[in-house]
Design a protein with these regions (language model features):
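Short secondary-structure boundary/capping segments
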Residues: 5-6, 46, 71-72, 106-108, ...
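Conserved beta-sheet core of the metallophosphoesterase superfamily
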Residues: 95-138
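A general structural motif
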Residues: 10, 50-51, 76-78, 128-129
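Active-site neighborhood of phospho(di)ester-bond hydrolases with catalytic His/Asp-centered motifs
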Residues: 16-17, 54-59, 79-85, 118-119, ...
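A short, conserved beta-to-alpha structural element at the edge of catalytic cores
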Residues: 34-50, 77-95
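N-terminal active-site segment of His-dependent metallophosphoesterases
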Residues: 1-68
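Metal-dependent catalytic neighborhoods of phosphoester/phosphodiester hydrolases
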Residues: 27, 58-75, 83, 88-103, ...
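A generic local structural motif
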Residues: 40-43, 65-70, 103-105, 117-121
Length: 138
């Protein structure tokens, strides 16, 4: 990660959004099985190795700091979190738990000159040539 809000994205980078861990009412908004949190954690850890990068496009978890600490302690990978509307943690708290918090968006230019902008909410309008990958819309 560099100071200009860039990150090297490769084919080994995992991208996910809107896990909403500890969101008690998420079932009202989108259909999830009863044990959805356990399934996400299991699938995450089955796929992601401890040294791989996970770029989370926001709304990682709700609730208190101990919930966040628990999740970062059991989920594999190096977490880069673009702050979503439900992510209310400070930069220093995230750093203390080995999570890189990205406040607004992440700009990435690939070797083939493709320009990507990762964000929680959709960015409209985009500058010419940029592709927006975002979460938020379920």
């Amino acid at each position: 990660m560099t100071s200009d809000n860039t990150l090297e994205i490769t084919l080994d980078t995992w991208i996910i959004s809107d896990t909403h861990f500890f969101h008690e009412n998420i079932g009202r908004y989108c259909s999830r099985p009863e044990n959805w949190q356990e399934l996400i954690i299991k699938n995450w850890n089955d796929l992601v190795s401890p040294d791989e990068i996970v770029l989370h496009l926001g709304d990682f978890a709700l609730g208190n700091k101990s919930n966040f600490e628990m999740l970062t302690g059991i989920l594999n990978g190096r977490l880069f979190l673009i702050q979503g509307n439900h992510d209310r943690l400070s930069q220093s708290f995230c750093v203390a738990h080995s999570v890189t918090l990205i406040k607004n968006s992440l700009l990435v230019e690939l070797e083939n000159h493709m320009k990507l902008i990762f964000s929680h909410r959709p960015i409209i309008p985009l500058e010419d040539g940029w592709i927006n990958l975002h979460g938020h819309i379920h």
